[in-house]
Structures are given as C-alpha cells and as structure tokens.
Amino acid sequence: MLDYMDYVQRQFEKSTDWNYDNSYANILASSRNILDFPVPNQFKFQLSNNSTPHTFNTMEVFSRKIFNGSMTYLYTDAENMDKLVHDSNSISLQDVTDTYRYVQPYYTHKPSSNGDNHVRSLYYGKMSYPSPNLEAMLIKRLNESTQLTLQCVSSFNGFNILTGYWQHDTGRNRHEVIMSTNDLLCGYRYLHNFLGTPSKLKTSLYNNFSLSLGGEVWLGIVTLSPGCSTTLRYCTHSPTTGRPQTLTLTWNPLFGHISSTYTAKTSSSSTFSTKYDFNLYSIESNLSFGCEFWRRGYQESSPQLQEQINGHASEPKDRIMYYHMMAPDSRNSISPRANSPQERQLLEDLTIAFSSSLKKIDKEKSMIEQFENRINQSNFTSVWKLSTSSKDKNLRLLWEGKFKGFLLSAGTEFCKTNPRNEINEVPSTENKLTFYPNKFGIQLQYST
C-alpha cells in the first residue's frame, strides 16, 4: 500500500499531467505489482493531515526491535490538490494500492487553456528519530514536457547521497538522465512508443495495442562498473471480453539474464501474472506466479468514485495517445453527398460491404468501455495478493483494505526449507522440508 506522501506525489503528477506509466523505470509495473509486492515486516502506524490545500504532513511510528519514528512535510503549488487528495475514509482503495496498470501514454503534449498548471513544484522533507536521518526531495516542472527531480539523503554517520533526475517526455519518447554522488553513478534511460498509422478503415480497436521499447545504461565512474538492460512491452485488450493484458520481455546482455512476463485481468476483480527467468550463462531458470483478488463492498458507487468516473469521461481525446485512431463521433461526422445515381449506388455498395466490420468495431469498443466502467464504478473494500516462486520456494501473502476509516495492510512470507541443514549437516535421507513464516507485519494509516 502506498504511503500517504507517495499518494500525494501521484496526485501531483496527475494534476500536472505527468504520465507515470510512460517511463522505463515503470515499464514492468503491472507484473511487479502482482509478483514482487512488498510484504511488511514490522508494525507501523501513520497519521497524516492535509492542513491547507497546498501543505501536507505525516507523523509515523514503527517498531521492529527498537522504537523509531519520522515526521514528513510536503508543499506544492499545484492546483486542485484539495480535490485530488482524499482522506482515508473517502479514498478509493485502487488509488493507494499498486495493482494492474492501464497503459495509456500521451501521444503529444498539446497546449491547453490550463497550460500554466504544468510549471509547478513540489518540496518534500523528512526527519527520522531517534537516528538523525534527513531526506529531502524537490520536483520542478520546467515546462510541459520537462521535469527535474533532486533527492538527497543525509545520515548521522556521514553517508550523504544526492541524486538528480532530468526527464523529457514528448509522449512518444521519454528521455531520462540520472546522476548520483554515490560512486559517481551516471545513467540514461529511454522509452519509445510505437504508434500505428491512422487509416480510414481501421480504428483504435483494430490497432488497439501499445508497443513500447526501452533501455537503460549505467556506469559507476569510481568503480567503473557498467550496467544495461532493454525491455519490450506489449499491451492490448481482448476483443471479445474487453479485458486488458500485458506482455514484457527483458534482456540483460552483461549478465545473460532473460525475463518474460504475462499479466492479464481475468475479471473486474481478479488479476493473474506469471514470470519466467532464464540465465544464458548459468543455465538457471525460475518460474514465478502471482494473483490478486478484490472484494466489493455493499455500495457499488460512492460520490467520490462517481466524480472520478466523470473526470475520465470528460477527458479530451487529444490528450490520449491513440486519439487519432479512435472511431469518429457520428454526430460530428459529415456525410458525403452523392451527385449522381452511380455515386449513390457506389456508396450503398460500400455501406453494405463494410457494415459487418463497422458493427464489429462498435461491439469491441463497447466491450472495452463496459469492462473499464465496471471496474471504475466498483467500490472495492479489500484485496488479497499472493505470489510464489519455484526457485525461492516461498509463499507471500498480503491483505489490504479499509476498516472504520483506517487503511490496513497485513502480510506474511512463508519459506519452505530445512533449518537444520543451515546449522548441521544432515543426511539427505533425513531431509524434511519445513514450512515456517519468515516475516510478518501490519501497517495502519489514517488521514484527514
């Protein structure tokens, strides 16, 4: 579950029209949220408050072996933050839970009447206790397509790190330059979205896919340690059910690691994901499986959810990546005129020839819209997550939900191993696998 400040940062990106999914760092977000979700390993309580429309603060305490805590402050000059950020009682569980991502990167950044809202800033500071650790972050939108982020960590033992991110997003391409004082690490990320060519006979449903290719290169100047990887992502919808699905393929040429994932929403309340890893050098492989199940409440649509649905419905088509391939509105279309009987006959023949295809297009479009609306209108109150791996031989469970105005997250991880083999040498005939919990934790959040 997202922390309150992470949730506020997501809403800041939404307010300034910054696309979270159009980034190489988040190209594997769908499978990562289902397979590699974090499991809490301690008790943590977080109390947050939206004191003014532009300031937010959080106080949290957590205990594992010793008592710790922190205080966090955030300020932003972005507009409509008081409407985007909700308290824990009225917030939608989907907004604070990392789940399947519906990839719709922007096609282009077009000037809008609210263009000044893109050039905004966010200031973040965190102080921990009893250890005097400090964290700071600055996000500055330079223009509609460029953003600068600075992150700083300072600890009492003199371990200080400053990291800078320069990002340029045109919708079709995303460039990102990273520099850090930790070993003088330098990196470059790039993501390219392939767009289909618009056609008179093909609409977004025949070209209903998102194909993205990206890569990253890293170099530690102090240690001269290189790193690189490349990933291909393909997103589409089922034409018969409207359910989305995502496939990815990742390759690391330095370590010879190949990874492929497949994630699909089997229904409006369930998602399944699989991942296969293979190493060309060691010939080792691993198969991972994960799923999540959402539970609906008695009230299917709250006013806050209905407001979000209306907001998505009123979004202009020119802000979506594939707006140029969407079917035109029949109310705004201009019918061609036939000046002769031969032309009228030709138009009638074309209408008869393509009537079945046009009906199929409308049916597929309706199926996708109905599936998305069914998810948006649902009032989910809890979600179960489960993942396992054949190599690690573990089982990870996580429950997240809402109760009496609180946001709760509880999880555990079970490992299947023989602890005696780690201490004493035991003959293979006496090996017996044990199933025991490796970690367990509970997190509570409350915000006003």
Swiss-Prot record:
Where does the UniProt annotation locate this protein?
Answer: Mitochondrion outer membrane
What Pfam families does the annotation carry?
MDM10
Q: Major location, coarse class? A: mitochondrion
Q: Read off the InterPro entries from this record.
A: Mdm10 (IPR027539)
Query: Which keywords are on file for this protein?
Result: Membrane, Mitochondrion, Mitochondrion outer membrane, Transmembrane, Transmembrane beta strand
A GO CC term attached to the entry: ERMES complex
GO BP, one example?
A: mitochondrion-endoplasmic reticulum membrane tethering
Membrane topology label:
Multi-pass membrane protein
- Domain of life, per UniProt, equals Eukaryota
UniProt function note: Component of the ERMES/MDM complex, which serves as a molecular tether to connect the endoplasmic reticulum and mitochondria. Components of this complex are involved in the control of mitochondrial shape and protein biogenesis and may function in phospholipid exchange. MDM10 is involved in the late assembly steps of the general translocase of the mitochondrial outer membrane (TOM complex). Functions in the TOM40-specific route of the assembly of outer membrane beta-barrel proteins, including the association of TOM40 with the receptor TOM22 and small TOM proteins.
Q: Which HAMAP family match?
A: Mdm10 (MF_03102)
Q: Which family does it belong to?
A: Belongs to the MDM10 family.
* Notes on the domains: Lacks alpha-helical transmembrane segments, suggesting that it resides in the membrane via beta-sheet conformations similar to those predicted for other outer membrane proteins and porin.
How would you summarize the oligomeric state and partners of this protein? Answer: Component of the ER-mitochondria encounter structure (ERMES) or MDM complex, composed of MMM1, MDM10, MDM12 and MDM34. Associates with the mitochondrial outer membrane sorting assembly machinery SAM(core) complex.
Please state what the protein is called: Mitochondrial distribution and morphology protein 10
